[in-house]
Amino acid sequence: MFKWLLKHRSKPTPLELGIFDQKVSFWKPFLLFCPALLTTFLFTLVPFFLTLQKGFSHNEDIYRVDSQQFGFQTFANLFSESNFILGLRNSFLYSIISLPLTIVLAIIISSAIVFVYRKLARGFWQTVFFLPYVTSGVAVSIAFIYILDSSSGILNNIFHVNIKWLDSGERDTFNALWGILIFGIWKNMAFNVLVISTAMLSVDPTLYKVANLDGAKPIRQFFKITLPSIRPTLIFLLTLLILGGMQVFPISLFNGNDSEAVTNGGSTILLYIFQKIRDQNNNFAGAATLVLFILGVCYGLVLRNGFRLIEWAQWKIKRHYVQTKLNLV
């Protein structure tokens, strides 16, 4: 019986390859990739090329359909429009001012949350600061309309001032821009706090233990351990804030009335594009879209290369300091 069992025992099955090691024909993964490829082509590439075509064409005669010519005349006319210049000013200043304020405030709040040692309290504060992100945008806009109201607004009552934030009636005023900044920073704070606090909590605690043994103070640990460890997260958030800053669309603060936004100095590039598309002036809308795209790309490149330049300068300074110490020894 024992010999029979040995003879008929099950043979070991050969080791199977993992799913990433198996040879698969080309068409199977390509078919899975086709929906995403088709969506990107239809809703990204095609609109982009149509925008290029509209932006670089202008009508010599508005009464003739076949009078469109290729050139830069639309861009020249675009920069001569006061509404576009106003929107360009507000969009640029919003992105320049809101970016550092949002990042710095989010880092400070996230640091406070991380240093709360009780897990229950930590999760509670994360939830509190994330609530604005999941709150209805309409409800938030209505709340800020009442907060920024010139006659009975909470902000004016707290500081005992009478600033017309959203209803000054002046095109060149900066009051509307400050109101848009307050609204935008508060709205973007929730997501940034959640992401940065999660990144801080994922830093290896061994690094802090070693730093404590070396006598490093908490502030030094923050700048030498925490910030370098969450650098990829900060770069990701900077990219999102750059795109969001240039594409600010504050029409909800003006009760959905774009003309009221322009009249009170609250116009932006995206609001200008919205007006031109509604008026079926696609050439100006396409040119403004290309200007917005170029500004966003240039702004992002300047910031990213600027951070790399700062890091390189810090490395050179530290290297020079170490070499000086070694030479003294």
UniProtKB/Swiss-Prot annotation:
Family as reported in the entry's similarity comment: Belongs to the binding-protein-dependent transport system permease family. MalFG subfamily.
CDD domains documented for this protein: TM_PBP2
Function: Probably part of a binding-protein-dependent transport system. Probably responsible for the translocation of the substrate across the membrane.
Protein name from the UniProt record: Probable ABC transporter permease protein MG188 homolog
Entry keywords, A to Z: Cell membrane, Membrane, Transmembrane, Transmembrane helix, Transport
Disulfide bonds: none
Coiled-coil region: none
Regions crossing the membrane: 30-50, 96-116, 128-148, 176-196, 234-254, 283-303
